[in-house]
Swiss-Prot record:
Family membership: Belongs to the autotransporter-2 (AT-2) (TC 1.B.40) family. Eib subfamily.
Signal peptide span: 1-26
Bilayer topology: Multi-pass membrane protein
Extra remark: Encoded in a prophage region of strain ECOR 9, upon UV treatment bacteriophage containing this gene can be isolated.
Region feature (Right-handed coiled-coil (RHcc)): 297-342
Protein's name according to its UniProt entry: Immunoglobulin-binding protein EibC
Domain notes: The signal peptide, cleaved at the inner membrane, guides the autotransporter protein to the periplasmic space. Then, trimerization and insertion of the C-terminal translocator domain in the outer membrane forms a hydrophilic pore for the translocation of the passenger domain to the bacterial cell surface. Trimerizes to make a lollipop-shaped form which consists of three domains: a C-terminal membrane-anchor domain, an extended coiled-coil stalk domain which binds IgG Fc, and an N-terminal head domain.
Region Outer membrane translocation of the passenger domain, residue ranges: 411-453
Function: Binds (in a non-immune fashion) to the Fc portion of human IgG and less well to IgA; binding occurs on the cell surface. Confers the ability to survive exposure to human serum exposure. Binds to the Fc portion of human IgG and IgA and to whole mouse antibodies also via Fc.
């Protein structure tokens, strides 16, 4: 005969059993366990009794042999509540929930089928038995309005509403949180996350191995392994491994970045020794065009501006060149006319030489030199003066041509530099898309929901033509507190985050 059983609700007409009734505090409705379905033979291994107190009904599973030892109690949702030293465990079983709902429907004459079997009872009891004997060391919860929580060897939460998690973790001030071995949150509302992270200032945050915020740097934030907000650097933010802020209201962005003055966002990074103080540079990509005087200008804006200057200069050079050419042609024509007028002479009817203008007959000057030898010196002087003017005009033309050539070379150099900057912008654009894809992937990671359990989660993300993979783990300490960490990878780059969740 099969050992399988099904809890079946019996009314007073089934198997001659009596349904007991009475007041809420004393009411017990018994449910029997048949040994085999449909044969009318009822076993005596288990008994399910519905008990009530203060209007809260539960189902208690007992062994019917001997003393009827109580195995466990579950509510109408199928939850088994186990209370330990400061810790409450909840076991939920769908079959128990199914049974409780079936019990309620039986009163209304509805179907009495359900899924609770003897194997379900044994499985739930084994879980209850194990949790009742589980001991968690290094865990402390102080009840009351100033409750504090500490978890880990030598962990200490001494501030009001403070939390210390990890070996040697310290949360000394009100609302302080320290998570990680030897992490210390020593300022009011301060948060220290990571091994050896120190948040000494009020309202400060230090996240990452050995991340540090000095006690005088109020509102300081240091995120990244060995990131540091130094003395008196109030409201400073160090983001990146070994990033350091030494100035007020300044931001050190990127690994090894170090600020140089107050109210500054600095992305350069330290490359030399302490005495050398050599700094490298980074490219800030993915920017919109600046619209205010205090905004940063993009290379695209500069390209358009330089292009406009180039077109304007080119147009001006063309106009000036045309003016110079017209002026030179005009002056040359005038000189030619004057020269021509002065290389002929008029001859009167009596053979006297006159000016060529208006003369009926003219002859070449050379022909008239025999008769006018006394005037040769004056004519030579006039011709020499004309030649000097022509020479000066020629020199002016050559000078303008050289200036045009120099301007052309300068424009070519600007064009080469702009091409180099455009290539750098394209590379930065790809890097920003990878960062966006990593951020999207990290956002897809789930945090843990079940108390006392770790979870492992993975997610993918993308932005434009870039993709990223993120993986993470988490742990829920209780219903109010959980922590998780994740890392994302994309084309050789990686980013990470660590978070802690408090629910009030």
């Amino acid at each position: 005969m099969s050992k399988k059983f099904t809890m079946t609700l019996l009314s007073s007409s089934l198997a001659g059993l009596l349904v007991m009734s009475g007041g809420v505090s004393a009411q017990e409705e018994k449910y029997t366990v048949p040994y085999a379905i449909g044969e009318g033979k009822w076993g005596n291994t288990y008994e399910v009794v519905k008990t009530g107190g203060n209007g809260n009904f539960r189902y208690e599973v007992k062994e019917k042999n001997g003393k009827k030892r109580s195995l466990f109690t579950f509510d109408s949702k199928g939850d088994v509540i186990i209370n330990g030293s400061g810790i409450t465990y909840t076991i939920h079983d769908g079959a128990l929930n199914d049974f409780a709902q079936t019990a309620e429907k039986k009163k209304n004459g509805q179907s009495q089928s359900h899924r609770m079997t003897d194997s379900v009872v044994r499985d739930v009891y084994n879980k209850v038995y194990s949790l009742q004997r589980t001991k968690i060391t290094g865990f402390s919860v102080e009840d009351g309005e100033n409750g504090k929580v500490s978890l880990g060897s030598d962990a200490k939460a001494s501030g009001e509403f403070s939390v210390a998690v990890g070996t040697g973790a310290r949360a000394d001030k009100k609302f302080a949180t320290a998570v990680g071995s030897w992490a210390a949150a020593d300022g009011k509302q301060s948060t220290a996350l990571g091994v050896g992270a120190y948040a000494y200032a009020n309202a400060s945050t230090a996240a990452g191995t050995a991340a540090y915020v000095d006690g005088s740097a109020i509102y300081g934030t240091a995120i990244g392994n060995y990131a540091k907000v130094d003395e008196n650097a109030t409201e400073g933010t160090a983001l990146g491994a070994k990033a350091t802020v030494t100035n007020k209201n300044s931001v050190a962005l990127g690994a090894n970045s170090v600020t140089t003055r107050d109210n500054e966002v600095y992305i350069g990074y330290k490359t030399g020794t302490e005495s050398d103080k050599t700094y490298g540079t980074r490219v800030l990509g993915g920017l919109s065009d600046g619209t205010r005087n205090s905004d940063a200008a993009t290379v695209g804006q500069l390209n358009r501006k330089v292009g406009g200057v180039y077109d304007d200069v080119k147009a001006r050079i063309t106009v000036e060149s045309e003016k110079q050419k017209k002026y030179t042609d005009q002056k040359t024509s005038e000189v030619n006319e004057k020269v021509e007028a002065r290389t002929t002479v008029g001859v009167d009817s009596d053979g006297k030489l006159t000016r060529a203008e208006g003369a009926t007959k003219t002859i070449a000057v050379n022909d008239g030199l025999v008769a006018l030898s006394g005037r040769t010196d004056r004519i030579d002087y006039a011709v020499g003066a004309i030649d000097g003017r022509v020479t000066r005009n020629t020199q002016s033309i050559e000078k303008n041509s050289k200036a045009i050539a120099a301007n052309t070379r300068t424009l070519q150099q600007h064009s080469a530099r702009l091409d180099s900057q455009q290539r750098q912008i394209n590379e930065n654009h790809k890097e920003m898309k990878r960062a966006a894809a990593q951020s999207a992937a990290l956002t897809g990671l789930f945090q843990p929901y079940s108390v006392g359990k770790f979870n492992a989660t993975a997610a993918v993300g993308g932005y434009s033509d870039q993709q990223a993979l993120a993986v993470g783990v988490g742990y829920r300490f209780n219903e109010q507190t959980a922590a998780k960490a994740g890392v994302a990878f994309s084309d050789g780059d990686a980013s990470w985050n660590v978070g802690v969740n408090f629910e009030f």
